């Protein structure tokens, strides 16, 4: 993580503050380690499955059929057909009334919990009275 962060910082001039755990695998120890580095973990609730090298139409149909308000969609930078699929995905979602926003507008500040679908929810507060 440190080596990747250094490379990203060198290229962008900005240190990363978010991280997607590989395969979405994490536990309390991973989250604690990430947070000790000044970062927050993020998850997704729509997997494009673009890594399976599906064609652009299949990726587009999969994503647009699963997106809901507040969705975070997982794409991979090395996937073969993602660049071809993205314009159609964006056109469809915008035509359906969605707005594409930076992930920073979708994630909650701690404390929060993440459910099995990857969605964040404010952590429940426990009353001590």
Residue ranges of model-derived segments:
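Catalytic domains of cell-wall/extracellular-matrix polysaccharide-remodeling enzymes
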Residues: 1-122
């Amino acid at each position: 993580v440190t080596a990747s962060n250094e490379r990203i910082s060198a290229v962008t001039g900005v240190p990363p503050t978010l991280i997607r755990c590989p395969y979405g695998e994490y536990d309390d120890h991973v989250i604690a380690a990430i947070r000790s580095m000044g970062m927050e973990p993020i998850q997704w609730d729509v997997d494009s499955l673009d890594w399976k090298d599906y064609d652009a139409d299949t990726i587009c149909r999969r994503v647009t059929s699963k997106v809901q308000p507040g969705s975070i969609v997982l794409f991979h930078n090395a996937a073969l057909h993602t660049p071809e699929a993205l314009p159609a995905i964006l056109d469809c979602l915008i035509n359906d009334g969605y707005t594409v926003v930076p992930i920073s507008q979708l994630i909650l500040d701690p404390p929060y919990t993440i459910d099995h679908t990857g969605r964040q929810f404010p952590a429940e507060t426990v009353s001590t009275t």
